[in-house]
Amino acid sequence: MSLWPDNDLTTRLGIRYPIIQAPMAGASTPALAIAVSTAGGLGSLGLAMHTQEALRNDCATVSAAGAPYNANFFVHSEPVDDPARAADARSLLAPYYRELGLGEVPDVVTATPSFNDTHLQAVLDLRPPVVSFHFGLPNADAFKAIKAAGLYTLSSATNVAEARELEARGVDAVIAQGFEAGGHRGTFSEPYERGHVGTLALVPQVVDAVSIPVIAAGGIGDGRGIAAALALGASAVQLGTAVLTCPESAAHPLYRRALNEARDDQTRITHAFSGRPARGLENRYLREMAGHEAHYPDFPILNTLTGPLRKASAIGNNTDFLSLWSGQSAVMSRNLPACELIQLLVKETESVLERLATAR
């Protein structure tokens, strides 16, 4: 008899284990998604920053492997045109540009489009088995078209109100993103501080509030965390930081080393890289930019302006200006191939479930 709880979600997703690899735009790869799905989980592609050609190529690569996968997109609001904040940001970044020999800070541009008609057409053409969204859901017509195509949909919520709104819009399952999670907060309500709810508290409240499956995310790094999430009523878990040190990820070697050396108290929520709140490991840039939040332009404008800093830092082999996105479970990172990591997580989870089942 299986130790895993009965789960309609795994059946619907076509996976053996209720373990989903977080999309992580910029760090996910087709190789990572294929490895996770081959091992029985659900691999994901973070496509928010992809060109159309790269988007279609990556989806085709994973699809050709015959494994289920999740295609993820950002659904952010269009940035507000604020010349004063744009000028402030350029002034703040200018010393770093000079230090790294990058010349003048470029004019403010938007280089990461929100989910749009071009993305929609790609989704309808490629038909990924699962389509997920961060920062809310697309407009009603686009979302209706995705649902009409029979694609399974996910979106992130950082509090109960967001989860209820997603269910009301017709999403198939909600990702309950606890405050411990690394990377961008999926919040789409204001102020974002309403999403400062830890995974242990958030998951059961969301489970009680909605009738759709709930996927737990945030601070889950081993089998103990997976078993705990299932005990709280989650139908599955989503892990991001745990897979960043897998060789199949696109994480820079310095990024991997920082994760391996991380402490439990080393992450911070910051707007300084992108203009949206995101959790990452503290470095020089985060320390020096602290307190300047009022001067940051909206996402994704600031993300575009800091892009050259991140690239130069990687080329220069230092972490001063890298966005080291990480959850609070980084200390649990293992340097294993993704397939081996999933197998280990399954073994760890089953060990915990067996111990709990036989406890007196």
Where do the model's predicted regions map?
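Active-site entrance/lid segments in N-terminal catalytic domains of soluble metabolic enzymes
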Residues: 1-209, 345
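Conserved active-site-proximal phosphate/metal-binding subdomains
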Residues: 96, 184-189, 193-215, 220-360
